[in-house]
Amino acid sequence: MRPVHKRNNRADTPAITAFAITSPMTSPVLAFYRGTGTDAAGPRIAQIWAWDHRRLEMVYDFIQWLFPLADPSRFNPDAPLLTTADIAAFYADPALQEDARRSLDLMLAFLGLRRGGATVTRGNEFPKLAAGWLEPANHNHLRLTRMLLFLSQIDLQAEARGLLACLEDIAGHEGAGKIQLRTLEFWRAAVPTAV
């Protein structure tokens, strides 16, 4: 079942007001993250973690599996929806959180970034790899929004804030004129402020 939506005041993003509860035993998200399920195209999570940068750029339907959200994807109708049961499982299971960090690290490396704890910085390959996504309206900006939202929902808010801080710094330097203000607003709306 799909979640029920209501608009909120925060950058006109949907606020989830109710979820259909999915048993953790049958959840496609948890089966995928635990390595017992595949995405709609067939690969298991460990196979995706082994993909090279070219494949990560060319394949579009895996990102909704690595970083699932409660909202249906307009680009991938077969993508699973993140449920409250899934979120609770990520909160409770350190192994699931570590696997989510591994998915994050995969995408950070693809973008030329790296993570140390919750801090995200430019990696050695940033100048070369940023050329592939540091341009106005690049589809990887949508991927980054999805990543930030997912991390914020599964108790990895520190990592989400670290990624956002790095993206804001990039937007003020190498990304000036390449990362649109609207994109920055979506990224900021995706990450809760520290308490």
Can you annotate each of these PLM segments?
Residues 4, 52-54, 68, 136, ...:
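Enriched - but not universal
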Residues 5-12:
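Intrinsic-disorder-associated, low-complexity terminal segments enriched in Asp/Asn/His/Tyr and depleted
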Residues 19-124, 158:
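N-terminal leader regions that mediate targeting or early regulatory function
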Residues 120-195:
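Alpha-helical bundle/repeat cores within regulatory domains of eukaryotic proteins
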